[in-house]
């Protein structure tokens, strides 16, 4: 198969390489600890939740994107981070070749390990283009994953229900 000769394709390989390097796989450029930054002292112990974080990831099986929303919760044990840092954590760990199931667990592990949290939970709701483009039924299907650790195991009330 030969590529069509078109002026629209001039520079396309470079644009695609830049897109993959600077956006789709940019998460490899830092660690979870770097994304979270230096934690702040906290004495309140109040449950922290951040919901509806938009994200995209890349399916390692098909090299096609998936996208949706991440919901995070953690119970601090004296260390917190700003909410923007939680968004950076999601970007860091999702902008890689990673299965959604693994991403869900990695986000929980990062909160537990980097913040030494008492507990952490994550729910992800996403649409996968590998399903959409292959024409599999049912149309509009979404993958929902959940993980929890520590004091938040079994606490379904800390995160919103995933889309139906």
What kind of feature is each model-predicted range?
Residues 1-164:
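A domain-level signal for the structural core that forms small-molecule/cofactor-binding pockets
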């Amino acid at each position: 198969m030969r590529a069509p000769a078109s002026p629209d394709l001039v520079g396309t390989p470079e644009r695609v390489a830049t897109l993959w390097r600077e956006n789709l796989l940019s998460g490899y450029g830092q660690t979870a600890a770097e994304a979270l930054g230096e934690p702040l002292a906290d004495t309140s112990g109040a449950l922290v939740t951040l919901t509806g974080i938009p994200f995209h990831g890349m399916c390692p099986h098909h090299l096609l994107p998936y996208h949706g929303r991440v919901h995070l919760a953690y119970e601090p044990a004296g260390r917190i981070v700003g909410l923007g840092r939680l968004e950076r954590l999601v970007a860091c760990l999702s902008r890689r070749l990673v299965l959604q199931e693994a991403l869900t667990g990695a986000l929980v592990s990062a909160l537990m390990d980097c913040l030494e949290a008492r507990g952490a939970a994550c729910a992800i709701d996403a649409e996968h283009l590998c399903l959409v483009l292959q024409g599999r039924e049912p149309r509009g299907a979404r993958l929902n994953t959940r993980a929890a650790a520590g004091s938040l195991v079994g606490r379904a009330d800390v995160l919103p229900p995933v889309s139906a």
